Amino acid sequence: MATRLANVPQREAGTILERKEQALKPPAMFKVVLLNDDYTPMEFVVMILQQYFSRDRETATQIMLTVHREGKGVCGIYTRDIAATKVELVSTHARQAGHPLQCVMEEA
C-alpha cells in the first residue's frame, strides 16, 4: 500500500511540471577607496596597494598620487564581502603601523 506524504502535492499521471526561470542579478559592486591624510608616508600607501590590491609598483604609485592630489583614490572594485574584508585588512595594518590612513568602501 502506498503511503501519502504530508505537504507533498499530488498530481495526475502524465502531468508535466515546468521549471520557472529565476532571474539572477549580478552582485552589487563596491569601490575600495583610500583617503588622503597629511601623516601617512607615500611609500606606505604604495606598499598597501601592492600587498592588498596586487598592484604593480607603477600602478600603485599612480593611485597613491591620485590619493595625494585629489584627496582619495580607488584601489579596486569588488563584491561587498571582499571589499569589506580589504577595508578591514588595510585599516588594521595602518593602525598597527601607527598611521592614520583611512580606507572606506563606496557603492560602485
From Swiss-Prot:
Pfam families listed in its UniProt record: ClpS
Coiled-coil intervals: none
Signal peptide coordinates: none
InterPro entries: ClpS, ClpS_core, Ribosomal_bL12_C/ClpS-like
GO biological process annotation, one example: protein catabolic process
Subunit structure: Binds to the N-terminal domain of the chaperone ClpA.
Family: Belongs to the ClpS family.
PANTHER family the record matches: ATP-DEPENDENT CLP PROTEASE ADAPTER PROTEIN CLPS, ATP-DEPENDENT CLP PROTEASE ADAPTER PROTEIN CLPS1, CHLOROPLASTIC
Entry function: Involved in the modulation of the specificity of the ClpAP-mediated ATP-dependent protein degradation.
Name assigned to this protein: ATP-dependent Clp protease adapter protein ClpS
